[in-house]
Amino acid sequence: MAKKVEKLVKLQIPAGKATPAPPVGPALGQAGINIMGFTKEFNARTADQAGMIIPVVISVYEDKSFTFITKTPPAAVLLKKAAGVEKGSGTPNKTKVATVTRAQVQEIAETKMPDLNAASLEAAMRMIEGTARSMGFTVTD
């Protein structure tokens, strides 16, 4: 018989840098997960993606065992890295802070494709372009 999922915990943690300190420790402690076991396994799985923020969904079962799924980094993080800026614009409709090319948008869309609710690469690119515009980025050909 399959184990019953008791709780789902969603976190965004820098790749390879999960520690028992807040915010990771308290979130996992409340769910009753072995914090050291999770941090070691997460860091091992994400060591190759250093510098990125990785969303993770942790399924906690009734017997306090757990499994987790790592997702692709958020589109905003990938866009900031591609544009080489620290943060988006405070007023995206007035102040444009950076420019990204369609090729960069396509690359990001291909990376994000497994996690996006898009039927085609074109649809995924439109989603990423929308995120870029809302951050105050200009998309150029």
Curated annotation (Swiss-Prot):
It comes from Streptococcus suis (strain 98HAH33). CDD domains: Ribosomal_L11 (cd00349). One of its GO terms (molecular function) is large ribosomal subunit rRNA binding. This is Large ribosomal subunit protein uL11. Keywords: Methylation, Ribonucleoprotein, Ribosomal protein, RNA-binding, rRNA-binding. GO terms for cellular component: cytosolic large ribosomal subunit. HAMAP family: Ribosomal_uL11. The lineage of its organism: Bacteria, Bacillati, Bacillota, Bacilli, Lactobacillales. GO terms for biological process: translation. One or more lysine residues are methylated.
